[in-house]
Amino acid sequence: NLYQFKNMIQCTVPS
């Protein structure tokens, strides 16, 4: 679940 959460944030916040 944590992996998915991090992935969602990365998709929302393109570094």
Curated annotation (Swiss-Prot):
Expressed by the venom gland. It is an enzyme of class 3 (hydrolase). Its EC number is 3.1.1.4. Keywords: Calcium, Disulfide bond, Hydrolase, Lipid degradation, Lipid metabolism, Metal-binding, Secreted. Its cofactor is Ca(2+). Signal peptide: none annotated. Its main location: secreted. One of its GO terms (molecular function) is metal ion binding. One of its GO terms (cellular component) is extracellular region. The keyword Mitochondrion does not apply. Binds 1 Ca(2+) ion. It is found in: Secreted. It catalyses: a 1,2-diacyl-sn-glycero-3-phosphocholine + H2O = a 1-acyl-sn-glycero-3-phosphocholine + a fatty acid + H(+). It comes from the Eukaryota. GO terms for biological process: lipid catabolic process. Belongs to the phospholipase A2 family. Group I subfamily. PLA2 catalyzes the calcium-dependent hydrolysis of the 2-acyl groups in 3-sn-phosphoglycerides. This is Phospholipase A2 3. It comes from Naja naja (Indian cobra).
